[in-house]
């Protein structure tokens, strides 16, 4: 049995296959996923699992150099923005319109759907290197 924190086989496989500057998306239950994008659906019920819990778990195994967030999170969900910043205080943030973030999911290795039910709880993680 795997000893590390991420025990979901699909998530673990995606992370293991990522290289420098590859993208992984994590988001709320309502985020539309483009056709052809691998979707790992973890949603069980309203807010379970939460966006932040899934993000924390992924960050235990993925080196992140940059994140992409919707501009709208600044005014529509500032609490979530603050929680993200606390998890990654030294990671560059690029804000883009929500409509662009949705389109950019087509460039991700996968999108992890959570049960989160708060607006604009979506992120694209850009992988870094560990050396």
Swiss-Prot record:
Molecular function terms from GO: D-ribose pyranase activity; intramolecular lyase activity; monosaccharide binding
Active site as annotated: 20 (proton donor)
Predominant place of localization: cytoplasm
Statement: the UniProt record of this protein carries the keyword Phosphoprotein: no
Cellular compartments per GO CC: cytosol
UniProt: substrate binding residues: 28, 98, 120-122
A GO BP entry: D-ribose catabolic process
Key words of the record: Carbohydrate metabolism, Cytoplasm, Isomerase
InterPro entries: D-ribose_pyranase (IPR023064), RbsD-like_sf (IPR023750), RbsD_FucU (IPR007721)
Pfam families registered for this protein in UniProt: RbsD_FucU
Free-text function comment from the UniProt entry: Catalyzes the interconversion of beta-pyran and beta-furan forms of D-ribose.
Enzyme nomenclature, EC number: 5.4.99.62
Name used for this protein in its record: D-ribose pyranase
Record keyword Transit peptide present: no
Family of the protein in this entry: Belongs to the RbsD / FucU family. RbsD subfamily.
Metabolic or biological pathway, per its Swiss-Prot or TrEMBL entry: Carbohydrate metabolism; D-ribose degradation; D-ribose 5-phosphate from beta-D-ribopyranose: step 1/2
Record's catalysed reaction(s): beta-D-ribopyranose = beta-D-ribofuranose
Domain of life, per lineage: Bacteria
Location within or outside the cell: Cytoplasm
Enzyme class: isomerase
Subunit structure comment from the entry: Homodecamer.
């Amino acid at each position: 049995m795997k000893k590390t924190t991420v025990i979901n086989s699909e998530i673990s496989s995606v992370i293991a296959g990522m290289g420098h500057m590859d993208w992984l998306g994590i988001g709320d239950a309502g985020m539309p996923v483009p056709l052809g994008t691998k979707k790992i659906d973890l949603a069980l019920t309203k807010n379970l699992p939460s966006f932040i819990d899934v993000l924390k778990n992924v960050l235990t195994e993925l080196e992140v150099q940059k994140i992409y967030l919707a501009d709208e999170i600044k005014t529509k969900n500032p609490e979530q923005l603050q929680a993200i910043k606390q998890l990654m205080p030294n990671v560059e943030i690029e804000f883009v319109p929500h409509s662009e973030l949705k389109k950019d999911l087509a460039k991700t290795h996968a999108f992890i759907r959570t049960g989160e039910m708060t607006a604009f709880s979506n992120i694209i993680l850009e992988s870094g290197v560990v050396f």
